[in-house]
């Protein structure tokens, strides 16, 4: 169950039609609050659920959705506001949030109210039904990037989209240019994505530039820069390209 959490009292459960809660096998008692309960995360897949009447099953489904997707919104929001305001006030640094993927609405509400910068990534757009985000629509209070440590590099996802498994330096330059022109306050791009604009500097195999694949336990944080800092500094053509792209507004 969630922790911290806002468990249900026996009276609340009774209002949903559930009594003798401990005998049902569909709830777990809160370890810190006796007489208060949490619905099982996978309750609908249990034999106990199958033994319920049709109306009780519908009630449990509604309760399950309410508990996991609605009940905690304000609870988490108030806790986050209380803690994050103190943390933000303790430093002069900009505060940025990693808000990619599925989010509870309270996360976005809290970040907006505290002016915490969001993270914007084209391959993980925040708009429903959109396959690829448009950097031109990013909010000012955001950090724009082309990839992260836990996702494919820009070369990789561009290659997946064009069907070749890789992207040319020209395609990479164009994508970076689009991101650098975004309204975001900051643009912070991984080194691999910058190197991808130069065919002589980037690695031959795009897949070897990925930092981490969360779905593969044998692939973790093993990327190492394949050229020295001195070699990169000496690459005048590359540095001119970076300078030109970084000046985009």
Label each residue range with its predicted role.
Residues 1-249:
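Catalytic cores of glycan-processing enzymes that make or break glycosidic bonds
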């Amino acid at each position: 169950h969630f922790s911290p959490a806002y468990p249900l009292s026996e009276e609340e459960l009774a209002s949903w039609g559930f009594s003798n809660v401990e005998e049902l096998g569909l709830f777990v008692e809160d370890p810190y609050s006796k007489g208060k309960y949490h619905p099982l995360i996978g309750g609908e897949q249990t034999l106990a659920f199958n033994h319920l009447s049709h109306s009780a099953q519908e009630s449990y489904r509604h309760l399950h959705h309410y508990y996991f997707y609605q009940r905690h919104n304000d609870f988490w929001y108030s806790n986050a506001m209380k803690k994050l305001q103190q943390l933000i006030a303790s430093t002069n640094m900009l505060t940025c949030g990693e808000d990619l993927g599925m989010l509870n609405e309270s996360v976005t509400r809290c970040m907006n109210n505290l002016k915490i910068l969001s993270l914007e990534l084209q391959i993980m757009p925040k708009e429903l039904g959109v396959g690829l985000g448009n950097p031109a629509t990013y909010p000012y209070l955001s950090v724009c990037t082309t990839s992260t440590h836990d996702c494919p590099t820009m070369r990789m996802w561009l290659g997946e989209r064009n069907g070749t498994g890789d992207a040319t330096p020209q395609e990479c330059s164009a994508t970076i240019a689009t991101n650098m022109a975004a309204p975001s306050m900051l643009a912070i791009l991984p080194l691999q994505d910058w190197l991808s604009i130069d065919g002589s500097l980037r690695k031959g195999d795009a897949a070897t530039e990925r930092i981490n694949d969360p779905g593969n336990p044998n692939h973790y944080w093993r990327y190492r820069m394949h050229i020295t800092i001195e070699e990169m500094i000496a690459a005048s053509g590359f540095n001119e390209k970076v300078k030109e792209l970084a000046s985009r507004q």
